[in-house]
Amino acid sequence: MAKVPSRSPRKRVRKQVADGMAHIHASFNNTIVTITDRQGNALSWATSGGSGFRGSRKSTPFAAQVAAERAGIAAQDYGVKNLEVFVKGPGPGRESAIRALNAVGYKITNITDVTPIPHNGCRPPKKRRV
């Protein structure tokens, strides 16, 4: 009879990280907030759409605020205290996401805009006619 390897239940220990980075991707349609450690390994993330907002309500500053709060609360389990913030994109949730992370209790050490700017690359979308 073959011996079945026993799978003993091991408690998973969460690594403790004091300093982290918050990547805020604010597009016109959604806002994605990811909190990582210094090496870039994701600790927690949240989106406006995943926070219960659908359609045009995803692209509001309030939806970005809720997403940033959810990502920030989830990252507190790892012991993150200080955040360096990287903001990408022109969306409406840029500032409100930063303010929400500050309100959760993080000390924001640095804010950097990493929006990619083309050196005359792809053709942009046509202008809207309303």
UniProtKB/Swiss-Prot annotation:
Pfam families (UniProt xref): Ribosomal_S11
Listed GO biological process terms: translation
Any GO CC annotation of this UniProt entry: ribosome
Key words of the record: Ribonucleoprotein, Ribosomal protein, RNA-binding, rRNA-binding
Molecular functions per Gene Ontology: rRNA binding; structural constituent of ribosome
InterPro entries (alphabetical): Ribosomal_uS11, Ribosomal_uS11_bac-type, Ribosomal_uS11_CS, Ribosomal_uS11_sf
Functional description taken from the UniProt entry: Located on the platform of the 30S subunit, it bridges several disparate RNA helices of the 16S rRNA. Forms part of the Shine-Dalgarno cleft in the 70S ribosome.
NCBIfam families: PRK05309.1 (NF003698), uS11_bact (TIGR03632)
Protein family (similarity comment): Belongs to the universal ribosomal protein uS11 family.
Assembly behavior: Part of the 30S ribosomal subunit. Interacts with proteins S7 and S18. Binds to IF-3.
Designated name of the protein: Small ribosomal subunit protein uS11
Species of the source: Shewanella frigidimarina (strain NCIMB 400)
Gene coding for it: rpsK
